[in-house]
Amino acid sequence: DGGQAQFIERSVPTDYESDRLGPLLDHMRKHLHQEHRIPDLARRAGMSERTFLRRFSEATGKTPAKWLLNVRLCEARDHLETSDISIERIAEHTGFGTPTNLRHHFREQMGTTPTAYRQTFGRISA
């Protein structure tokens, strides 16, 4: 582990306030626990699916799925560092659904398990 937290880039679109995607990104962040399907996101943004995918990628540098995974991982990491919420609840709250899914994606991105990360970087003794 080395005792150093791994960096997860926090994707922020260019011209966030003026961009039509800003409110949509806020909505997605506030509803991480929900499924976000491309047709629904495009409709919410008032765009065709093709235009939505192009604009989303231009604004964030990622596909919606990769952006959402990144945001979910950042939120999970924040919970692990600052709370004693169970891994199960973190998985539900951040949209991973199950602890197994959270562990898989967390290990893939961070190189460690959520439990080991919490033991190393957590600020609250669980």
Task: Please name every model-derived segment.
Residues 1-7, 16, 20-37, 56, ...:
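Basic, amphipathic alpha-helical hairpins
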Residues 62-64, 111-114:
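Short, solvent-exposed alpha-helical "recognition" segments
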Residues 2-6, 66, 116:
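Short, polar/charged, Gly/Pro-enriched helix-capping and turn/loop motifs at alpha-helix termini
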Residues 26, 35-40, 47, 57-99, ...:
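Terminal helix-turn-helix DNA-binding modules in bacterial transcription factors
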Residues 10-11:
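Anionic-ligand binding region
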Residues 51, 100-101:
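Residues in the helix-turn-helix
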